[in-house]
């Protein structure tokens, strides 16, 4: 199967392709859920009254098939075919196999660049939330331990010598405070990930009348990237 960027009458040596691809398909499967979620928002925007680049009938047809793919992803039965370039190509391939030319319309007004970026942003946002929840749970545990063991004494060392009395509670509390600082870093990372890159195209925007505010709201982003070049950085 020809790759998305493969030039006519040219092919890549199988060993080179295997080396460069590596474990990409495995990592791409992690993005599959978010790729479909991003596409659902994209086609809804394309069919909106402010854009009208997709008919309501085509939007409903695409949405139905995308949701079927989403069910397969969540069931763990979705896979990327051998020779398929990436998860984005796999999803489009399934749509065009089922819907013909209608399936190809999903790529209107969207570059592979901003499609990949929105997948990554959605993935990072979800994982940061998971980690933040785990950090919060561990913080609560350490604080309880700190309070429970505040009177359980241990020697405090400096320069390998006993210096002052300390306690298990003090040390549990120290690690709890470290987690507070980690949570602040996670919050900052979440804010950076919580910006919508859709509509930035390949880094220079789009000539289509895309509604970036709409996809921002549909995907739960705080705001779109203001500068389309920065969205790609």
List the predicted regions and their residue ranges.
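A helix-coil-helix interface module used to build multimeric assemblies
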Residues: 1-205, 209-218, 222-224
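Amphipathic, heptad-repeat alpha-helical segments used for oligomerization and assembly
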Residues: 225-233
């Amino acid at each position: 199967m020809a790759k998305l960027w493969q030039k006519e009458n040219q092919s890549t040596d199988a060993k080179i392709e295997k080396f460069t691809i590596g474990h990409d398909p495995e990592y791409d499967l992690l993005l599959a859920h978010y790729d479909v979620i991003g596409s659902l928002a994209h086609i809804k925007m394309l069919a909106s009254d402010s854009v009208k680049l997709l008919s309501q009938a085509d939007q409903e047809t695409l949405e139905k098939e995308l949701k079927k793919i989403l069910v397969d992803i969540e069931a763990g039965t979705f896979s990327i075919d051998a020779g398929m370039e990436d998860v984005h190509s796999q999803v489009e391939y399934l749509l065009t196999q089922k819907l013909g030319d209608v399936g190809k319309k999903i790529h209107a007004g969207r570059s592979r660049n901003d499609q990949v970026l929105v997948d990554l942003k959605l993935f990072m946002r979800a994982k940061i939330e998971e980690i933040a929840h785990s950090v919060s749970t561990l913080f609560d545990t350490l604080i309880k331990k700190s309070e429970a063991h505040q009177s359980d004494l241990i020697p405090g060392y400096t320069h390998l010598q006993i210096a002052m009395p300390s306690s298990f509670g003090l040390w549990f509390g120290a690690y709890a405070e470290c987690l507070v600082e980690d949570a602040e870093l996670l919050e900052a990372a979440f804010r950076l990930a919580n910006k919508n890159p859709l509509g930035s195209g390949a880094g220079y925007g789009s000539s289509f009348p895309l509604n970036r505010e709409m996809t921002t709201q549909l995907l739960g982003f705080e705001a779109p990237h203001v500068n389309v070049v920065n969205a790609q950085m």
